[in-house]
Amino acid sequence: MRIDLLLVLMVEALALLFAAKLARDRLLKRRGYFVNELVVGQRSLGAAISQAGYLVGILLGFLGAISFAGRATGFLAMVGHVALFGLVAIVLQLLADQLSDQLLFRGLAAPKGTVGDTNVSHAVGKAAVSIATGLVLRGSMSDPTAGVVACVAWFAVGQALMVAAVLFYCRLTPYDDLAEIKRDNLAASFPIVGILLALGLIMEAAVATKGDGTMIQTALHGGKFLGVSLVLVYVFRVIASRVLLPKVKLANAIVEQRSVAAGLQEGVSFLLVSLIVTYFLS
């Protein structure tokens, strides 16, 4: 890539991140959150983590758009494509944030009009949603044959799978995951973070390895890849947890001892296995 194009794309990336931050700040301000005051004035780690995850997710989508734009013909076409999909990424990331509050972390958001965001466990989970969504967007936006509709469709599939996977995991655990996160138990948050990031990686790989043909054939191919990957991730995750944490009762370590180390190992096991599975299946 020529140096002048590289400089233009870097400027466009910074402009996109600035626009994304402004859009999120305006939206949260309507709910009683003043992000800059929380981060700088109150030194809220939770507010900083959730904002950082959101910006990383935005940048991941931007990188996907660039990988396709590199094959575009003409300077204006490339810049326009990146700008369009950058704006799409902002809208979808903000939507994902709203959906996670309603479907994944229901009841954990501070009431409207309050100015506190100190629950780090909740913030880590929301940051994971943003990053996982960014991975899905990076995969869909890097496809030269896909448009905005296809990108939105993959986004919808990704959000549905995230909700289903987390709710399924919560049904398996002998404790109330949301109650523990509400208590700011970071140990209970990390397994959910691992699941979300693992799904983001799997979804990105599914988009990248989809078959050629009609939209129905593409959906069937992607669905088959996702199904096999999710089953293998769950099976190998059970094996990995036995290796990483032998003779340890995770529920007791997470709830009673509030062991962040145990929760982190649980979450990492999902992430490690998803990397292995997607590498060999893609």
Regions found by a protein language model. Give the residues of each.
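Alpha-helical transmembrane segments
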Residues: M1-F18, L76-Q93, A146-M162, Q217-V233
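Membrane-interface helix-loop junction between the first two transmembrane segments
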Residues: A19-G41, T173
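A generic, lipid-embedded transmembrane alpha helix
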Residues: L45-S67, A128-G134, V193-A205
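Membrane-interface helix termini and inter-helical loops of multi-pass transporters
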Residues: S67-L76, S140-V149, D177-L178, V207-A219, ...
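Membrane-interface helix-loop-helix junctions at boundaries between adjacent transmembrane segments
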Residues: G74-V88, D97-G125, T145-V149
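Alpha-helical transmembrane segments and their immediate juxtamembrane interface regions
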Residues: L84-A109, A160-R183, V228-L250
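Interfacial loop-to-transmembrane junctions
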Residues: P246-G267
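Juxtamembrane boundary at the C-terminal end of a transmembrane helix
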Residues: S274-S282
